[in-house]
């Protein structure tokens, strides 16, 4: 395919275009402390990694089928596993809402310049992701997305 035939460039969201700021363990620590958690960042990171991997395995076994309901359930399970001692629906909601806020994210340093150059060359730019519906509000609040 010739470059002149390319009309759009599609970017993945998390890990390619944007990332949580502060990182997930730090955000989880702040939220967890509000509910009495005394976990260290290392403990949170370890528990998160294990819980996330378990959910990834479940999704892989199901053929990667997802939905808004499944995404909410998977994240609620992850939060519950990380904060087993203090887990509550309110803690989950706090974190769910936190990661829907553009202020909890930042674009990588090279994104704005890259997107500007591509737009100047006439390409349409898109973000495609398996992130749930919260991504739309995050992108709306993060220039240049």
Map each language-model feature to its residues.
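Substrate-recognition "cap/lid" segment bordering the active-site pocket of phosphatases
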Residues: 105-106, 126-128, 132-145
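Generic structural signal for beta-strand residues in well-ordered domains
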Residues: 1-3, 118-120, 128
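N-terminal helical cap/lid subdomain that shapes the substrate entry/recognition surface
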Residues: 3-108, 121, 133-136
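Catalytic-core regions built around general acid/base machinery
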Residues: 110-123
């Amino acid at each position: 395919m010739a470059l002149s035939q390319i009309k759009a460039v599609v970017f993945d969201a998390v890990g390619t275009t944007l990332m949580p700021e502060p990182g997930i363990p730090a955000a989880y620590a702040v939220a967890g402390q509000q509910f009495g958690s005394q976990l260290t960042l290392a403990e949170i990171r370890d528990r998160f990694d294990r819980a996330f991997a378990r959910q990834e395995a479940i999704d892989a076994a199901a053929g990667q089928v997802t939905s808004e309901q499944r995404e909410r359930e998977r994240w609620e399970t992850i939060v519950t596993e990380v904060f087993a001692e203090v887990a509550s629906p309110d803690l989950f909601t706090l974190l769910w809402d936190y990661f829907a806020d553009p202020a909890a994210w930042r674009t990588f340093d090279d994104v704005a310049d890259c997107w500007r150059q591509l737009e100047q060359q006439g390409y349409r730019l898109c973000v495609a992701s398996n992130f749930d519906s919260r991504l739309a509000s995050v992108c709306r609040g993060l220039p240049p997305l």
